[in-house]
Regions:
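Adenine nucleotide-associated cytosolic modules
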Residues: 1-181
Length: 181
C-alpha cells in the first residue's frame, strides 16, 4: 500500500493520497468513508463487500461494486436512496464454503484491471454529472467469450437494508467467507 501511494504521489504530486492502515470493520467503516464523494469497492471477501455496501447506505455515499472470479467480472453502481442497493440483488452473504475461494477457483489477473477501469469510469461520470451510470443493472464481463451482458434488477421493497421495513439498522461485521464474486 505504501509503495502504491508513493507511486501515485510521484505520478501526480497534486493528488492527495490517504492511507487507512487498518482493516475495515463495522466500528470504523463510517469514519473511513465520510470524507469521500464516491467509493470504489475493490474488496475481495463477501464480509467486506456487504460491509462497504451497508456503510455507504448509512452514510449516503454513492459507490461502485465489483467482483471477479475465474474468467468473469461484474460491476454495478449504487446511489443510496435513489437506486437499488447491493442487498437488493444479493441479499445476504453466502454461507462459508458455498462459493470456492479465489485460490481454489482461480482468477484471471487482467479482470481486476478491466473491471477496475469500468469502476473508475463510473466514478468520473458520477463526479462530472454526465453519462448513464450502471444503476439498477449489473454489468457482467465474460473473458472466455469476450462478451458483456447486463442483468437488470429493481429496488426490492423487502430488502433487508433499503426496503420498507429494513431489518439492518446498524453496521455489523458479517461472518467472513471465501473470496467474493
Amino acid at each position: 500500500v505504501e509503495s502504491a501511494a508513493a507511486k501515485c504521489r510521484a505520478t501526480n504530486p497534486d493528488v492527495t493520497v490517504r492511507l487507512h492502515p487498518e482493516h475495515l470493520r463495522a466500528d470504523n467503516a463510517l469514519a473511513m468513508l465520510q470524507d469521500y464523494d464516491f467509493v470504489i469497492d475493490g474488496t475481495d471477501t463477501f464480509a467486506a463487500k456487504f460491509l462497504v455496501a451497508d456503510a455507504c447506505h448509512f452514510a449516503g455515499k454513492p459507490y461502485s461494486h465489483a467482483g471477479i472470479l475465474r474468467f468473469e467480472g461484474q460491476t454495478m453502481t449504487v446511489l443510496p436512496g435513489r437506486s437499488a442497493c447491493y442487498r437488493c440483488l444479493f441479499g445476504e452473504p453466502p454461507p462459508p464454503g458455498a462459493v470456492p475461494s479465489c485460490s481454489q477457483a482461480g482468477v484471471l489477473g487482467v479482470l481486476a484491471g478491466i473491471v477496475g477501469t469500468i469502476q473508475a469510469a463510473e466514478a468520473v461520470k458520477y463526479l462530472l454529472g454526465t453519462g448513464d451510470l450502471l444503476i439498477n443493472r449489473l454489468l457482467v464481463f465474460d473473458a472466455l467469450h469476450m462478451s458483456f451482458r447486463q442483468v437488470g434488477f429493481k429496488r426490492n421493497p423487502a430488502c433487508f437494508l433499503c426496503g420498507s421495513h429494513p431489518s439492518i439498522t446498524a453496521l455489523r461485521d458479517e461472518v467472513p467467507a471465501a473470496c467474493a464474486y
